[in-house]
């Protein structure tokens, strides 16, 4: 996806450009991985394409070459990459994607050369149906026993056959308390209500993501984020279109930096991005992250092995490494996203565990939805969102 060392992040934190430069310095570009795989995808990709396999048998800790990781940017502590490289004596090459649709398009093009990818929940179901994922050898992932019960039977992959959970969180609204007051209402109205948004006209951002942003509009209107009713989707698209004049941008890259940099006052985005930005800028008292009372998206990002992964055993070993209790805690302490790793809880910073915006209480969680694969309606989400933005 990225050209050279350019990184287009979804979960960009204000560890920001320094971390991005450090990662870029120790990572290959997508071009380099494609070259290793034999070309830029499709049937003409070259003679050294990996042979697709539906399953593999590996020993715990076994490696069969380097690790090619395709992840969201700024979504893993660089020290974990270094520790994995040193412990197993393998190189790690990282590339980054900005959203699930870009991820899918890249993998569908063929011969990506990637081993482990980090798709969100609903995308696992889509890729599984298309035969793009390898069935995991759970014998090679003994730390799978650390996965919390809530994450052991998800609807998109009920038996954890094709994925392991990585991180989870929510998508909501962050506001400047200078604008919103000390006790801001938890509502999507900060974006969609013209009266609430009147004083912050031009200082609002929304994610440049069809399912997330259409989902926010759907919940504000009282519908499911997974609606397949054309009239409801059109109503949501119309609401977004009416909102565009109030927006500074549709942005999935810098929204948290823009907020803490006081260029915007309200931002739609991912929980952990905001918390990391507040922490890095020592601005916890200046901003609030809100899970809207109308309901919002709860998501879980996952680790999966591609069906044509060149190094499937190294891939399994990496997944097992991340599922280690202390490594899982290190990941959460760095990203500020909730961990699906039950064994990691004792090593996670207490302030994170106690924060209801990171680990929502039951009454809030009851109004959260996972984004699901809506089949043929996916195209409608994409097309209507594109029309609304224009």
Question: What are the language-model segments listed below?
Answer:
Residues 1-24:
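Sec-dependent bacterial lipoprotein signal peptides
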Residues 26-28, 41, 46-126:
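Early extracytoplasmic/lumenal segment of secretory-pathway proteins
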Residues 68-71, 75-77, 102, 113, ...:
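Extracytoplasmic ligand-binding site segments that recognize negatively charged/polar headgroups
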Residues 123-126, 266-285:
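A ligand-binding cleft/hinge motif common to bilobed small-molecule-binding domains
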Residues 146, 233-242, 248, 283-309:
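Periplasmic-binding protein-like
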Residues 172-179, 220-222, 299-314, 321, ...:
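A bilobed periplasmic-binding-protein/Venus flytrap-type ligand-binding module shared by bacterial periplasmic
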Residues 257, 362-390:
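Conserved C-terminal helix/tail region of periplasmic/extracytoplasmic solute-binding proteins
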Residues 306-365:
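Mature extracytoplasmic/periplasmic domains
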């Amino acid at each position: 996806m990225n050209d050279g060392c350019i990184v287009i992040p979804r979960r960009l934190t204000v560890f920001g450009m320094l971390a991005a430069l450090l990662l870029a310095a120790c990572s290959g570009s997508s071009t380099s991985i494609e070259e290793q795989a034999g070309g830029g995808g499709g049937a003409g990709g070259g003679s050294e394409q990996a042979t697709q396999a539906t399953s593999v048998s590996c020993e715990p800790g076994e490696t069969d070459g380097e690790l090619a990781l395709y992840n969201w940017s700024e979504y893993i502590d660089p020290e974990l990459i270094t520790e994995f490289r040193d412990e197993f004596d393998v190189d790690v090459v990282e590339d980054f994607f900005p959203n699930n649709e870009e991820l899918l398009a890249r993998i569908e093009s063929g011969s990506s050369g990637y081993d482990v990818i980090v798709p969100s929940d609903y995308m696992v179901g889509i890729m599984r149906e298309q035969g793009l994922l390898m069935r995991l050898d759970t014998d090679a992932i003994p730390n799978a026993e650390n996965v919390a019960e809530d994450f052991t039977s998800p609807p998109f992959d009920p038996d954890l056959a094709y994925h392991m959970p990585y991180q989870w969180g929510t998508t909501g609204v962050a506001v400047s308390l200078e604008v919103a007051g000390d006790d801001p209402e938890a509502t999507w109205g900060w974006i969609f209500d013209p009266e609430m948004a009147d004083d912050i006209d031009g200082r609002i951002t929304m994610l440049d993501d069809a399912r997330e942003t259409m989902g926010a509009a759907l919940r504000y209107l009282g519908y499911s984020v997974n609606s397949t009713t054309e009239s409801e989707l059109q109503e949501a698209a119309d609401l977004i279109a009416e909102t565009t004049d109030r927006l500074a941008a549709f942005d999935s890259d810098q929204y948290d930096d823009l907020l803490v940099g006081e260029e915007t006052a309200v931002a739609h985005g991912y929980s952990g991005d905001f918390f990391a930005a507040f922490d890095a800028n020592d601005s916890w008292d200046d901003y609030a992250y809100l899970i809207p009372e109308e309901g919002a998206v709860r998501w879980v990002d996952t680790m999966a092995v591609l069906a044509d992964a060149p190094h499937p055993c190294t891939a399994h070993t990496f997944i097992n490494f991340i599922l280690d209790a202390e490594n899982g805690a290190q990941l959460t302490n760095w990203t500020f996203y909730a961990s699906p790793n039950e064994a990691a809880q004792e090593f996670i910073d207490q302030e994170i565990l106690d924060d209801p915006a990171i680990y929502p209480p039951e009454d809030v969680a009851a109004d959260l939805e996972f984004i699901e694969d809506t089949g043929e309606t996916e195209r409608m989400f994409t097309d209507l969102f594109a029309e609304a933005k224009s």
